[in-house]
């Protein structure tokens, strides 16, 4: 049974089937293009390519998608597919360079999801007219200086720019941390893999954050304050 037959069994109406199948087909097409380049670069045999595809087809349907909304189904499928491909690529390629290539592939695929869900979340915020002028918060002292009809700061855009700076700073730290650990332990290629894993994990956290907010905006019309680095709002870990 191929992956699209399984998808058809998950959805119950013709409209849902068409939307879900099209969305997933588009994601597979983009991912396959990137995968083919990687397969070609590392001379991955056809049987190993088929093995990865088969394993990931099985992996994405381990969970029961039918109890989720269409939006959640698509997201769960996307991340499960990428994670499975990264894991199986690493096993097939085997070498340190191959594992690093698989992690870089995962980073690129999650970066596509970052752009996708940032745009969807942004569109939903605008649709619900949730933007707020700079200074229009009770804790900001310049609230009285906001003139009626004045266009304020795009807080979501500013937040995303701040996150991009945070990402760059985090990745710079990870590289220095890797160099230090490598030096202390007298070398070891495993540390470069740890570095790439940490880099990918940071990006995945942001993608999940944006998707969660997008889903909350659609279902509840609001979002919660997000913690970062495992810290709660009150500062506890």
Where are these regions (language model features)?
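Classical Sec-dependent N-terminal signal peptides that target proteins to the secretory pathway
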Residues: 1-33
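N-terminal alpha-helical modules
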Residues: 32-237
